[in-house]
A protein has these predicted regions:
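Accessory, solvent-exposed terminal regions and/or long lumenal/extracellular loops of proteins
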Residues: 22-30, 94-245
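Contiguous transmembrane helix-bundle modules in multi-pass membrane proteins
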Residues: 1-124, 219-246
């Protein structure tokens, strides 16, 4: 990512030199402020390095590359199409990297802190949100795939206000089951809810408890936006032209 940032500002050699010389400073900032990203940034990945420290090492160069890449795209707008769309592909890559750091690197998918046990008709608080399990939904007929479906209807509240009703569940096949994910889309990212499929039998027998995994994924929109920008720009480059040099 540092190399990509340097390439983005290659027309300003002095800035490239300062950028490469600042690499030790980025490492120091990551070591001192790795915990400041929040979420699961304090979780240790190995060798005494936590998720936040690794995230900052990638995030700072990506943020530095963002304005430079936008500037290159603007300079080529309305000129030769291939360089313009090529810079848009690079812009999409930068956005994807930033979103990946925020929604994946600093989020630990395997920790028990994301497991929430809900009691029917009672609100349970988790990380500023409240979840209320209201009913179990079952379906065996009319399914496009699978032999049966079991879902839990859950109201999601923020600051005491209902923001959405979701239904994470389990899709059953003859030999195995598959969790069906539901999510709440917000301006900062997605709140993803996954039901633990091992409790399907107890819910079918009338249990008032449901166990879900909850992941608050900030910046996930940047992942999808960056991916879409890269795909559309690539298609635009491949489109036939009357003049192959355009």
């Amino acid at each position: 990512m540092l190399s990509f940032t340097a390439w983005s500002i290659r027309d300003r050699p002095q800035r490239v030199f300062y950028l490469m010389a600042s690499t030790p400073l980025i490492l120091v900032v990551a070591w001192l402020f790795g915990d400041s990203l929040g979420y699961d940034s304090t979780d240790i990945l190995g060798a005494s390095l936590n998720r936040g420290q690794i995230g900052i090492v990638v995030l700072i160069p990506a943020l530095l590359a963002l304005p430079a890449t936008i500037s290159l795209a603007k300079e080529n707008f309305g000129k030769r199409e291939i360089p313009f769309f090529a810079h848009l592909i690079h812009l999409g890559l930068v956005l994807l990297v930033i979103g990946h750091v925020m929604s994946t690197t600093i989020i630990d998918r395997g920790t028990f802190s994301h497991t929430v046990t809900l009691i029917k008709d009672e609100r349970v608080e988790w990380e500023g949100y409240e979840f209320e399990f209201t009913e179990v939904v079952t379906q065996t007929d009319g399914l496009e795939v699978g032999d049966g479906y079991l879902g839990a209807v859950i109201n999601v509240y923020e600051d005491g206000e209902l923001i959405e009703t979701v239904e994470p569940g389990v899709l059953r096949f003859d030999t195995r089951s598959r969790s069906e994910v539901d999510r709440v889309s917000m301006w900062h990212g997605d709140l993803v809810l996954i039901m633990d499929g091992t409790q399907a039998r107890s819910l079918m027998e009338g249990s008032d408890l449901v166990r879900i995994m909850v992941y608050d994924l900030p910046g996930i929109h940047l992942v999808w936006g960056g991916w879409a920008l890269m795909l559309l720009s690539s298609l635009a480059i491949w489109m036939p032209r009357s003049d192959p040099t355009d």
